[in-house]
């Protein structure tokens, strides 16, 4: 609160006038009175409670029977969003009300904590997609699988089938702890510092669906890895644990908080603590409780952990964590070592038990349910019963005997899942886009897939010269679900002026990236004034800027480094 100089008024007592400030909606400071419609809906009824109404009322009564506060609010707590109505162009996204944009079908997000799937579970997801979702699935960049074209009448049966094999959609969306990211090679990699699976399982078992965390200010994202490649995009999660080796205390985790992208990107920061493995769940509970109790709730666009961290700083965050929420302070700890290895795990790799895992590239995450079923069959026919999606829209087949590796590689190729993809197929991810998302302005997956095909044709002979995966991330709106600010080439969907005409296109971000081998620290991409790309021009722009990079780079210079030093003209 700012304090002004005393103001003198004739005939009145002199007093200090204060600039009035509105409460931020912090429960621990301002109390729990709801300060906006979303908070009112959450206070009126916990989002977890809507499941019973879905099963007993809405599935019987159909879409028209759904209460709007459930449809546009609480359904998310069970992984359900209404889809975008087909045929509404991106220019109308901001003009129409949400109910005018929505179809009477749902996207359903299947929660896959740590990406840990059995082939039986994968087959069930594929069968559900084929039977109830028009044979369309998307692997997301948060290790989830999303189904489309789901009718409310079918939701209880889908839940029954998922839960019969140990899957669920609990808190897959909403103002809750979202799917927990974990290294896709947890427990199998020869070079991991520690297997984070026990810590992941403890958090999930204790806190998934816990009403004490079912009303957070907004979404809350967690990541944990024990792998030296730092393969869980920890810098852009609300709470992350990255394996480190303490000189006196052994292997544990470095704690990061406050990362997120969207329209106001902010990279997470270290609190400087060492978290022993046995205290990870306690520390996660403490950080999450801080967000619940002190997070800003009045304005939705300020309600992420990153805004609280920006105001508090890391010293206060650590002090509040240790003094108010932990049983005892944490020791100081070292920063993670520079990353080693490719975090997407594409290719054939030996496991610590002598078997192999094989990482394959999807095409921007889009797969049919039939393909998922065939993938489960392929894995099982070759001795594997485990698969794992990654945070890069890739998928791993685990536990393959050495003599079966060639058979799996060939089978993956037949499924359109190459384990030796081009640099462009390997490096490209895309969000859902205008096909299904009510927030989107531009098509993403089809445009990105077309660009991959074109770049493979035009630049195939240059791949040895390029010598690195140049990441291309395509997003349909400013919210950055596809992490555009942390890509070599990030494309943000918007309407752009091309030759005097307003058309769907993209704003370009260049030179972003998270910590990886050859890049010690994360950094956000730059934008170039006036640089816009039409929706059908992704490959044209990418080819142009890659060829300029090859012509202008210094020896050993990465694309990201070059993009930050190049002048605007070179980046057009």
Task: Locate the predicted segments by residue.
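Peripheral terminal and linker regions in Fe-S/redox and tRNA-modifying enzymes
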Residues: 2-572
């Amino acid at each position: 609160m700012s304090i002004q100089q005393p103001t003198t008024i004739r005939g009145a007592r002199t007093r200090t006038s204060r600039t009035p400030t509105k409460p931020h909606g912090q429960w621990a400071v301002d109390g729990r009175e709801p300060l906006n419609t979303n908070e009112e809906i959450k206070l009126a009824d916990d989002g977890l409670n809507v499941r019973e109404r879905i099963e007993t009322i809405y599935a019987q009564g159909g879409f028209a029977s759904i209460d709007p506060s459930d449809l546009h609010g609480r359904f998310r707590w069970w992984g359900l969003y209404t889809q975008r109505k087909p045929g509404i162009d991106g220019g109308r996204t901001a003009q129409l009300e949400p109910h005018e944009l929505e179809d009477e079908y749902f996207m359903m997000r299947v929660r896959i904590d740590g990406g840990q799937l059995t082939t039986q579970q994968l087959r069930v997801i594929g069968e559900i997609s084929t039977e109830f979702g028009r044979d369309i699935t998307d692997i997301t960049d948060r290790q989830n699988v999303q189904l489309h074209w789901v009718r409310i009448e079918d939701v209880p049966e889908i839940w029954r089938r998922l839960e019969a094999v140990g899957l669920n959609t609990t808190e897959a969306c909403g103002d809750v702890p979202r799917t927990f990211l974990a290294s896709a090679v947890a427990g199998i990699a020869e070079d991991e510092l520690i297997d984070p699976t026990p810590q992941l399982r403890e958090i999930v078992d204790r806190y998934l669906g816990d009403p004490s965390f079912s009303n957070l200010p907004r979404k809350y994202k967690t990541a944990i890895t024990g792998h030296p490649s730092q393969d869980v995009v920890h810098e852009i999660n609300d709470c992350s644990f990255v394996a480190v080796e303490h000189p006196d205390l052994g292997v544990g985790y470095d704690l990061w908080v406050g990362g997120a992208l969207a329209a106001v990107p902010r990279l997470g920061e270290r609190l400087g603590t060492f978290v022993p493995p046995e205290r990870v769940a306690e520390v996660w509970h403490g950080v999450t409780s801080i967000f619940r109790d002190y997070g800003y709730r009045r304005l939705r666009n300020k309600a992420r952990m990153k805004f609280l961290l920006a105001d508090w700083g890391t010293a206060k965050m650590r002090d509040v964590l240790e003094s108010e929420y932990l049983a005892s302070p944490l020791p100081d700890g070292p920063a993670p070592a520079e990353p080693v290895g490719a975090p997407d795990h594409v290719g054939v790799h030996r496991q610590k038990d002598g078997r192999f895992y094989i990482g394959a590239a999807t095409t921007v995450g889009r797969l049919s349910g039939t393909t998922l079923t065939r993938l489960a069959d392929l894995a099982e026919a070759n001795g594997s019963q485990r698969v794992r999606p990654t945070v890069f829209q890739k998928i791993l087949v685990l536990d393959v005997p050495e003599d079966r590796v060639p058979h799996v590689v060939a089978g993956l190729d037949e499924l359109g899942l190459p384990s030796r993809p081009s640099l462009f197929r390997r490096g490209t991810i895309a969000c859902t886009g205008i096909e299904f998302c009510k927030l989107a302005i531009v098509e993403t997956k089809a445009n990105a897939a077309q660009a991959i095909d074109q770049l493979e044709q035009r630049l195939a002979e240059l791949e040895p010269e390029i010598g690195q995966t140049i990441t291309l991330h395509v997003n349909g709106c400013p919210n950055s679900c596809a992490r555009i600010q942390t890509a070599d080439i990030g494309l943000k969907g918007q309407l752009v002026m091309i030759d005097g005409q307003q058309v769907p296109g993209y704003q370009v971000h260049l030179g972003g990236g998270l910590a990886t081998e050859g890049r010690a620290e994360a950094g956000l991409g730059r934008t170039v004034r006036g640089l816009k790309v039409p929706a059908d021009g992704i490959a044209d722009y990418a080819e142009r800027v890659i060829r300029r990079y090859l012509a202008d780079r210094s020896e050993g210079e990465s694309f990201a480094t070059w993009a930050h030093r190049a002048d605007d003209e070179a980046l057009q």
